[in-house]
Amino acid sequence: MAENMTTTQIEVGPGATNATINFEAGILECYERLSWQRALDYPGQDRLNRLKRKLESRIKTHNKSEPESKRMSLEERKAIGVKMMKVLLFMNPSAGIEGFEPYCMKNFSNSNCPNYNWTDYPPTPGKCLDDIEEEPENVDDPTEIVLRDMNNKDARQKIKEEVNTQKEGKFRLTIKRDIRNVLSLRVLVNGIFLKYPNGYKTLSTLHRLNVYDQSGRLVAKLVATDDLTVEDEEDGHRILNSLFERLNEGHSKPIRAAETAVGVLSQFGQEHRLSPEEGDN
């Protein structure tokens, strides 16, 4: 891990996803208009094509998770994205764009709009990422799994056994990967297990997931804030399974925290939350 690696902070939220997709669609519209004017060079044309392909794929994936009444085409999102640019550039409060609602704090000495202090509406009012505790909340008897020099089959089996023996209620799972002298990540998962009368246990809620490097530095953080907690049982299992698969690949090269976070976030369709710069760490 690089010494100057910074913490990758991630928040999963459908509102932010819509805003991002719509804004990028607005950027695509600007690229296309510039191209029509024959004012776009070859690298710019290449970026236009790549952005269009990326957006078409993201919209297709995102629409699957939306009710039919809220699904939008690329063209519809372009129109919203252009309006969002007007909001950003001209601070026009009358735009009324879903998923992007800027607000202003009134200056009591003067109620004219130009004297408002503008800011982006926080995804969770009153709570920002940096205000959330870094460690998953304390629980009794946390489970720790140390995978040392195990082949993939044995490692997966050990994880499966440990997870399935969790008692009902909150849990914290620590996974340490150490194989073939590969740099390992320490992963803390915080969630809730439910126990059924027939003895079957299942992960019902995933609250938080932190990834640390060998020096104990927090390098990736997936946060589900109160209104964004993953409540779906299948989502919880997919996220954990994706994480376990990533940790158990046993590649000879160092495991990268950003890649691990991408693997987890992809289960939400939220891998874009990592910037290219963070992904290169």
Swiss-Prot record:
Gene3D superfamilies: S15/NS1, RNA-binding
Top-level taxon: Viruses
Keyword Transit peptide belongs to the record: no
GO BP terms: symbiont-mediated suppression of host ISG15-protein conjugation; symbiont-mediated suppression of host PKR/eIFalpha signaling; symbiont-mediated suppression of host type I interferon-mediated signaling pathway
Record has Mitochondrion as a keyword: no
One Pfam family per UniProt: Flu_B_NS1
Region of interest (G1P2-binding), ranges: 1-103
UniProt-recorded Gene Ontology molecular function terms: protein serine/threonine kinase inhibitor activity; RNA binding
Extent of motif Nuclear localization signal: 50-55
HAMAP family associated with the record: INFV_NS1
GO cellular component: host cell cytoplasm; host cell nucleus
Assembly and oligomerization: Homodimer. Interacts with and inhibits human G1P2 conjugation by UBE1L.
InterPro entries associated with the record: NS1, uS15_NS1_RNA-bd_sf
Upper classification of the organism: Viruses, Riboviria, Orthornavirae, Negarnaviricota, Polyploviricotina
Protein name: Non-structural protein 1
SUPFAM superfamilies: S15/NS1 RNA-binding domain (SSF47060)
Family: Belongs to the influenza B viruses NS1 family.
Principal location class: host cell
